[in-house]
Regions:
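N-terminal active-site beta-alpha-beta segment that forms phosphate/nucleotide-binding
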Residues: 1-82
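Conserved phosphate- and dinucleotide-binding cores of soluble alpha/beta proteins
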Residues: 2-5, 55-227
């Protein structure tokens, strides 16, 4: 197994029968969905309720035969297992390069435990060192957000999809990918400023949310717990 698969498999020990499980989005989360589906088919896990974090994870769960439920049906998940684009030593995260940050955060904040699975390359000493920060904005007046994001020290770039068309999220919004020279030194302040601005729907800063990170490498999987 590759490091992502190893991390995904390690997360299975936190899942037991009758759990409501938040189903993450992305390549690493997909390995978890495969492992979860195999355990369900083998009868090792029973009465699992999968809560998808995107249309992508919803489609994948249907393909794999994972029973799906909405947040209205499962307002509190026992656990969510998801990937991350960056993992800081204190388990603060950047997520959202796959475009599902809003739904991922909604499901995560309605979960008793958020378990992050990633490979060693996603571990950073400071958020923003490698990955841009995705910021989801309403389509109405989205052009006006660029100046505000620059005022926070970011170098924003509007995300475009295939054919050069503006990328649109599952929720009908746009995304600015924001690079910060030297990384994000004041993540809490940046998050607070973003939350105050009308038209900014959500950011990929997941601060104080993860309980455990399982980091896969060629040498195995190491577990990091929030202190």
């Amino acid at each position: 197994m590759n490091p992502k698969q190893c991390a995904a498999q390690a997360a299975m020990k936190y899942v037991t029968s009758q759990m409501a499980v938040g189903l993450g989005t992305g390549t690493t989360a997909d390995f978890f969905l495969i492992s979860l589906a195999q355990a369900i088919k083998a009868g090792e896990l029973k009465e699992i309720k999968g809560v998808p974090t995107s249309r992508q994870s919803e489609r994948r769960a249907i393909e794999l035969g994972i029973p799906l439920f909405s947040l209205a049906q499962c307002p509190v998940c026992d656990i969510t297992v998801d990937g991350a684009d960056e993992v800081a030593p204190n388990l603060d995260l950047i997520k959202g390069l796959g475009g599902a940050l809003l739904r991922e955060k909604i499901v995560a904040q309605n979960s008793k435990k958020l378990v992050i699975i990633a490979d060693e390359g996603k571990v950073v000493s400071q958020l923003g060192s490698k990955s841009p920060l995705p910021v989801e904005v309403a389509q109405f007046g989205y052009e006006t957000q660029e100046g505000f994001l620059r005022s926070l020290g970011a170098q924003p770039k509007l995300r475009v999809g295939p054919g050069g068309m503006v990328f649109v999220t599952d929720n009908g919004n746009c995304i600015y990918d924001c690079h910060f020279a030297g990384g994000i030194k004041n993540a809490g302040e940046i998050e607070a400023a973003l939350n105050r601005c009308a038209g900014i729907v959500e950011s990929g800063l997941f601060l104080g949310m993860a309980s455990i990170a399982l980091i896969g490498s060629e040498g195995g999987v190491r577990e990091i717990r929030r202190g």
